[in-house]
Regions:
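Solvent-exposed interaction patches of small proteins and small membrane subunits
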Residues: 1-173
């Protein structure tokens, strides 16, 4: 196998592992939050780092995971010989292969991620709504993480070097 192809395969393996690690850390952070969060609870605990640190981690890791998955999906498309000239084509390929449920679901998740990248301010009702919406979409991203890894292994024989994170994700409630 030529070195460029081998390098590309190694890069995808690294993206898969980074995605699985990030997904596991996202779940671990989310597990530290008493869901659903409410406006009243956020206001009452506004200086409580035991609540706000894991919320900040959920916010950060949700966006990071989507970024990692987007890069991994594009790279998978390249290695599979698909047209990756636009991300919409990448999403269409991934939807066709069952990696994502639908282009629309991914785009809705992405819109939520884009909101997560901005300051959520002091409106506790909006903040609670934002975090509860993120929490509701975590299973979507976990599913994409696992299906992407399964597809890469089944079609290209590529997998993350460390299987522990994928195993932990599969057994996570």
């Amino acid at each position: 196998m030529n070195s460029l192809l081998e390098e590309g395969r190694g890069h995808l393996a690294g993206l898969l592992e980074a995605s699985q690690r990030c997904a596991w850390h996202l779940c671990a952070s989310a597990d530290r939050v008493p869901w659903p969060v409410t406006e009243k609870e956020l206001a009452a605990r506004s200086m409580d780092l035991a609540l706000f640190e894991p919320l900040a981690a959920v916010n950060e890791r949700f966006g990071k995971l989507q970024d990692l998955l987007g890069g991994a999906m594009r790279h998978l498309g390249v290695l599979c010989g698909e047209d990756t000239s636009t991300f919409l084509r990448v999403l269409s390929f991934c939807a066709k292969e069952g990696i994502i449920e639908s282009v629309e679901e991914w785009q809705a998740c992405r819109a939520l991620r884009n909101r997560a990248a901005h300051d959520y301010g002091t409106n506790y009702a909006a903040t609670a709504g934002h975090f509860n919406a993120l929490h509701a979409q975590i299973p979507v991203l976990i599913g994409v993480t696992l299906r992407l890894a399964a597809y890469a292994f089944q079609t290209l024989g590529i997998r993350a070097e460390d299987p522990r994170f994928a195993e932990a994700l599969r057994s996570h409630g």
